[in-house]
Amino acid sequence: MGDSFDDRFPKPQFRDRFPAANESFVQRQSPDAPRRRTAQAEPAPYQVASLAPTAPYQRPAREDQTTLVSLKSSAFPYLGNNPRTDEPFLNISKGDRRGHRSYGGRVYWQDETYNDNRVLMHVPENFDVRKPGVIVVFFHGNGATLERDVRDRQLVPQQISDSGVNAVLLAPQLAVDAADSSAGKFWQPGGLKRFVAESAEHLAGLYGDPGAAKAFANMPVIIVGYSGGFVPAAWSLEVGGLGNRVRGVFLLDAVYGELDKFASWIVNNRSGFFVSAYTRYTKRHDNELVQMLKEKGIAISEDMDGPLRPGSVVFVETPEGVTHRDYVTHAWTENPVKEVLVKMAATPALTRMAAGAASS
């Protein structure tokens, strides 16, 4: 069988790609999941200045909060160099348009593919900023948009809510609906740190308590990368600047390269966990990474039966018939993002605030 982009991503039906106007902003639910309605965050109530004592800010009751926010620190637009070639990322022009010629020779234009700085943010209704929690940073794969794929098809916000774990989501738009894994600003030193820092006030607003920004600014981070999301995931581990705030890495059929960066993080960060689930498309690279780790004396598990602890390294092969396109919802189990979060939450050390996080 082939291993082309079309093999891994068979074209969906028209309805899958272009939902009707009246359902575009509705978060789709699995049949057995409780129904939730996405609501907008309530603005803070207007208050008149007073010398008298006032009650502390009370966060209004709310439901799941899911929205798109533009961030300067998101992956694109990106005007820097491609670190693989040390040449400008935008390496082709036509009139006033600038674009990027990919390794496969295809040209993608900045105004169509690399100009969306929006981030999908999600705060579950039961999230409590006063308790230990994590920020899940999700790097999507090729041929994706945040609404159609990450939210509605892969159900990443819903998986986080359904896990019951005290977690929020940040999912930056990478190359829009393109066969391109470029990391943009996540290639840059400190890129992930700036991204999470800029997100803090927006997450606090979505949560309904502006005072929660400090907690979000110091919260531990879990990186999830699907397919082509391996590039920003790897570079975020290598140069992202978050140090031991990154408590876990979960790759979904995503080990297509950057093995040295993943191996280095695993060897040097024994306080976090690493999980890679894979199909035949990435099996060769996963096996190569396993061998690299064994040579460094790292113990490897080959199933998800046990708990996730600091230092856990797990590689899970999934059988034939499990498709790459549906892997974010159907891997070794249904809703694997939910499964990993549940196993992570059973180990308090993984969600405890890192020492010195406020200054990291």
Question: Which residues make up each language-model segment?
Answer:
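Extracytoplasmic/secreted cell-surface and envelope-processing proteins
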Residues: 146-148, 178-181, 231-233, 257-262, ...
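A domain-start/cap signature at the N-terminus of enzymes
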Residues: 3-134, 301-302, 352-359
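Alpha/beta-hydrolase fold nucleophile elbow
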Residues: 212-227
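A catalytic-pocket lid/entrance helix-loop region that shapes and gates access to the active site
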Residues: 255-257, 264-284
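Short glycine-enriched nucleophile-adjacent loop
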Residues: 230-241
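A conserved short beta-strand
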Residues: 243-256
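C-terminal catalytic histidine-bearing segment of alpha/beta-hydrolase fold enzymes
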Residues: 46, 55, 276-360
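Active-site machinery of serine-nucleophile hydrolases
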Residues: 130-205
